[in-house]
Amino acid sequence: MDTLLERFLRYVTFHTRSDATNPACPSSEGQLIFARALRDEMEQMGLTLVTLDEHGYLTACLPGNQPDAPAIGLIAHMDTADYAAEQVVPQIIESYQGGDICLGKGDEVLAIRQYRCLKNYLGQDLITTDGSTLLGADDKAGIAEILTAIDYLLAHPDIPRGDLWVGLTPDEEIGRGADLFPLDRFPAKWAYTVDGGELGELEYENFNAASATVRITGNNVHPGTAKGSMINSQTLAARFHAAMPPEQTPECTDGYEGFFHLAQMSGTVEESTLHYIIRDFDDDAFAARKAQLKERVASLQLDAPKARIELTLTDSYRNMRSQIEPHMHIVELARAAMLAADVVPKIKPIRGGTDGARLSFMGLPCPNLFTGGHNFHGKHEFIPLQSMEKAVATLVALVRLTSAWRG
């Protein structure tokens, strides 16, 4: 699997951090630079119908050798999260023997007391950061795994397969990855995002998601003469957040539990703004959370009638479970592929979202498969090489098993 490691180390050198403040697609030039390099690589590999559009969506096809087999797709994203992502310098810990891992030359440490999952990888080769950037396994590991699986299929033409479509997207990390996805040139019956975490993850449920902005306008006067006239919006903002349920936050929830998350807060005496994200798996509970926020805004407005309190709610994405359940064979095929690759499937909900969630509602059912990575979006991100190899083996098995499926 030297090609897999080489690919991944090459990919993470591309600076592809997306930019939520830029409405263009892609939101950063680095994503287009990376996409052009991947386009050239796909053409050199011999893939057909390789197409890169002006928005940075890259699609290609590995033609099948079984005419009656269903065409499927594999999808990954090219951007990285809103965290330091320039000049990524990975380090490789060969045959990890346990204990803390020093990241680079500074004081950053991948501590086993904090990341107990490290004990699962004794004797394996871990790819980490140098402590100054993220790694970019989310989702450059997925891209490397997809193309390495295709390399294997090209080298083993006796493996039965239907048409295999590849789709690489920009701006997934800022929630726009599916906005302009070219379904007209991606004729797969169903697809899989390769954008999950640890070895064995298989996901077909995700959060319902919304964002909420609470804007509070007060009245600023000289503090020496403020009695009876000043309305400090920051005081009201603090009161508003203090009334939110403290046990329903990201740091206090897991599994199928939803939450409110105060992502950003800013203010002056005159005006304060609170930005929340709202998450829940259950449709009714999700609706109740949005209703609860409306009630709290109305309650604070009654308590402070001279202030102006406004709420803006925006739905982001929905739980894809309802779109996958009529097609559960695609989950069972993925599960069988993992078992064929000696991987124990871990079926769990995604406490987040993927391009696949949006695409599932656009008519392309799209569960999520593991990449092998841990601690995405930060300097403690790492991925075991052996987990990446298992991802490749799973994808090859998935293509083979799907070739025999007839619905």
UniProtKB/Swiss-Prot annotation:
The keyword Metal-binding applies. Zn(2+) 1 binds at residues 77, 138, 195. Its EC number is 3.4.11.4. Keywords: Aminopeptidase, Cytoplasm, Hydrolase, Metal-binding, Metalloprotease, Protease, Zinc. The active site is at 79, 172 (proton acceptor). Belongs to the peptidase M20B family. Zn(2+) 2 binds at residues 138, 173, 377. This is Peptidase T. GO terms for biological process: peptide catabolic process; proteolysis. It comes from the Bacteria. Cleaves the N-terminal amino acid of tripeptides. Binds 2 Zn(2+) ions per subunit. It comes from Aeromonas salmonicida (strain A449). CDD domains: M20_peptT. NCBIfam families: peptidase-T, PRK05469.1, PRK13381.1. Its cofactor is Zn(2+). It is found in: Cytoplasm. GO terms for molecular function: metallopeptidase activity; tripeptide aminopeptidase activity; zinc ion binding. It catalyses: Release of the N-terminal residue from a tripeptide. GO terms for cellular component: cytosol. SUPFAM superfamilies: Bacterial exopeptidase dimerisation domain (SSF55031), Zn-dependent exopeptidases (SSF53187).
